[in-house]
Amino acid sequence: MVKPIYLDYNGTTPHAPEVIEAMRPFLESEFGNPSSSHWYGALPRQAVETARRQVGELLGCPAQHLIFTSGGTESNNHAIKTIAGSLFARGTHIITSAIEHPAVLEVCRFMEGHGFSVTILPVDENGLVDPSDAAAAITDRTILISIMHANNEVGTIQPIAEIARLARQKGILVHTDAAQSVGKIVTQLDELGVDLLSVAGHKIYAPKGVGALYFGPGVQPGVFCHGAGQERGIRAGTENVLEIVGLGKACEIAAANLEQNAAHMRTMRDRLEEGLKSALDDIKINGHRVKRLPNTTSVSFLDLEANRILEKIDPVVAASAGAACHSDHVQISHVLQAMQIPERWAKGTVRFTTGRMTTAEEIDRALDAISAAVRELRR
């Protein structure tokens, strides 16, 4: 069976071969508990700390400012819930944006039910947050701003450094969900200036079920999971050594080849976009033209339904929809709604995302399949 061309790298990524090899000993022989003081615990303990250093080198931060989690969702929950909880006496106001991942928006909704108020910032037609809107939303009760670094649907990269600068002037902490940006663009913490940053392993060719949370100097995250005191007493539970090793190796690879990989993904993305624009009328590329992830293209096909397009191309191309079309209504993603994309365009939005393994031959075959499907649906 020939597998479809994979163009959903923002959804998840395949395991890099080097990641699989790095993890192999911890599947086959190195089963020890890293908390054990005997011989069997020594190598797993060393492997966890090596991985912590590898993640830190990609982000440009000391290893001691990182804890391992089960992924981006847990990191976001931890960053918002425990920090907000620890600062409750100082303030109860959180600022976020309308295009955040549910792993941030749903946490903020949870906090609203526990004594906090939340301001949701709008975005422009390109999906950008205006830092002046963030500044205007700050009150004397604001304790945390959580804005994603790059959007998972349209790829728009937010002005996080500028938002962090204005927040710092007011003594407000800033968290960024960097699940989509880590490994694709520069995420050096000295440039971003944030206090907390979330990482998701499965977006960077590491396994699902592992991630990391950075917390900056002076930031004291509360205990998220009580128990035997692993991860500096912040997140108890025996470490998932196998997947932590995989995350570390993935970060090492990303750090070594960041520019090269970004250039390749951008070339493949641009080949797809230019091909679609040449072959088809009435299409629109969503997101910022320049401030956009190098691998991400969100394409709206006028007066078509995304799920119909995906059904047509499914044997050849794997991608994802920006709108779910049901028999009686169209459910447009909250991101496209926030960008105020007209329904005639939004309902036909498909996200294609390239990766390190995408080839020009795959893009050309995908172009043929997508173009043929759209033409057939428009007859």
What are these regions (language model features)?
Residues 1-379:
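Pyridoxal 5′-phosphate
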